[in-house]
Each structure stands twice: as structure tokens, then as C-alpha cells.
Amino acid sequence: EFGLKPVKLIYDKQPSRFEIPTIAIFENNQLVGKITLMAVHGTETFINEIAEDFTGDEIYSSLRFATDLMRSRKSVEIGVGVITSIHIKKGKRILERVLQVLPRILTEYTNSEIDTIIIGKIAAVDLDVNFTEKEYNHIENLLNQDKTKFYSDKAKEILLKIGYRENNNGILYSISQM
């Protein structure tokens, strides 16, 4: 079973021409990495290419499971995809493995105290390890506004649907388990 300790989720509602959601990972208010999510098309080739970016049957199985899940629910638009690319700054690998679908964010972190996650369309579609200066400044601006929530109604709706709960401060907590 995996659980996620309380993590502050900030929603970026800034309009963007990019359709790829990105999670920015912060440790003590410092960017330590980002996770880029791509839509799942369900093809064997697509999944095989993704699996080659990682090692181990476990990750491969997780990606296959997530793809099957998305495929089986294609009549209901979930609006999220599978974690397919992991970009870590400074070469620090903080994700031990990848588990299924974005909103659960049920990933094991190794030796990291993650305190803030920004969910939103904040990143360009590329394979660069580092954020562009524009991306970084945009995220910094969001943090500096010192608000607990920047709602993307769709994102919030999805998170609540799969087991997150909101407290009085507008912070969503995961109560999901696997």
C-alpha cells in the first residue's frame, strides 16, 4: 500500500498554448525536478519506447496498466495521461518508480521532503532537463503570490473524483491507497 503525506497542491490557471500538463517538484521551495505528462494513445510501440527510458519490469508493467486503464475509460474523458517523462534537475533521481495515473501522484520518493507540487500547463513540450527562464519565472511568480490555490476547475474535479479531499485552507490531501 502506498499513501501520500499532505502535500500542498497549487493549480496554475494561466492560459497556455501547450496541452501537456507538467508537475513541478519543489523541495524546500527549490525546484528539484519536473514530471511531464503526455496523452496515452495506447499503442504497443508508444509504450515500448517509454519503457526504454526506465529500467525494470515494474515500471513497464505500471505503464502498461495505466495505458489499459485509459483505454478502458476512453468513453469518459479523464483529461490526464500517464507519467511518461521524468526530468530531474542536477541529475538527482528522486522518483523511485512510476505508478499509474497522474492525479493519484502515488509515487515513492527517496530521501526527499516534497512540500509543494504545482499542477498545470506550465511547461513547453521538450526534453530539456531544466526549465526555461520563462517557465521558471512563471513558477516563481506563482509561489511568491503566497496563495494556497490557483484553481484549474478541471484539475480539481479530477483530483476530487479519484480520492483527494479539500480542507478549509484549500489544500487537497490524498487519501488514496493502492
For each feature predicted by the language model, list its residue ranges.
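Non-catalytic substrate-recognition and accessory regions of acyl/acetyltransferase enzymes
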Residues: E1-K90, R104, E108-M178
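Conserved glycine-rich acetyl-CoA-binding loop
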Residues: I88-Q100
